[in-house]
Amino acid sequence: MLEKEDFLKNEKVRIGKLYSTKKHGKGFSNKDEFVKWFENTIKAQDFKCYYCDTSIFDICSLINQDKLKTRKTGYGTRGPNLEVDRKINSNGYTKENCVLSCYYCNNDKSYILDSEVYKKYFGENRKKYFEYLKNKK
């Protein structure tokens, strides 16, 4: 498993490549500001998903054990990284409106559910499910 600092170094490169003025420009004036927000947020969230409170390292371990599936996209693989999610989808990508979410919660929450409702009713169960997978032989 990568140490936190090595993981963060790789993630900062990855997240910098995802910055788009069109998509993120409202809340982040440039790529460096976006990357700095990401670094501060991932540390504040202790490398855990905002919704299910599961460590990205536990999620990566489950992926490596083939207990969780990933999804290939045109820009990489969804699953082994925390993703930038808008708490209120109708609002833009701003520091106040964004959190880091695992792929599984982000995909599940989609644009349909309120972030706090999702966190309360689904996040806790997702965490229990991940714990179940960790203990499953």
Regions found by a protein language model. Give the residues of each.
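Histidine-centered nuclease catalytic patch
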Residues: T54-C98, K109
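Short Cys/His-centered divalent metal-binding micro-motifs
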Residues: F57, C98-K120
